[in-house]
Amino acid sequence: MNAVPDGRSDKPRSVVGVLALQGDTREHLAALTEAGAEAVTVRRLRELEAVDALVIPGGESTAMSHLLREFELLEPLRARLAEGMPAYGSCAGMILLATEILDAGAAGREATPLKGIDMSVRRNAFGRQVDSFEGDIPFVGLDSPVHAVFIRAPWVERIGDGVEVLARADGHIVAVRQGRMLATAFHPEVTGDRRVHKLFVDMVSE
């Protein structure tokens, strides 16, 4: 662990990285800090090696896959996930954490699965940008619904053994957990509700 002391208590804060190649990095950094983590950006291998956990933000999954290869992070990230590093993916991050990506993109520019969570995820399943929507949905483990913002959002079409469904929207799976990995099809980082990030920070400390 690379946890750092928390001045408010004797309990060290987990160092949680946010993959900062593309996507809404700043919003996740703010949410993680408010949830009690030491939040840092990750763009290089040495930065990936220094964190206790990683958030893969929303953005464009094919662009992120390309940049992971360009920055020589794809295989090291896969290896850290296989070793058990906690990870949270929102929207595009959910897509990349899957073992299988449906409608992965044009040949040569496909989104590449990191194989962190045993699930099949369909890209842009809820539609294009103009089909983006938001609403309140129940979330397992939280005492009241979360306000979920869906932007060109995916959904989960298959889950493996050991994957827990945490939320659904319109009958589709939109949040899951497997061990210390978490994924949501929506963007809790943009709403001001920090409960999903707090759930992840608590998972990192387990």
Curated annotation (Swiss-Prot):
Coiled coil: none annotated. One of its GO terms (molecular function) is glutaminase activity. It comes from the Bacteria. SUPFAM superfamilies: Class I glutamine amidotransferase-like. GO terms for cellular component: cytosol; glutaminase complex. It catalyses: aldehydo-D-ribose 5-phosphate + D-glyceraldehyde 3-phosphate + L-glutamine = pyridoxal 5'-phosphate + L-glutamate + phosphate + 3 H2O + H(+); L-glutamine + H2O = L-glutamate + NH4(+). In the presence of PdxS, forms a dodecamer of heterodimers. Only shows activity in the heterodimer. Belongs to the glutaminase PdxT/SNO family. This is Pyridoxal 5'-phosphate synthase subunit PdxT.
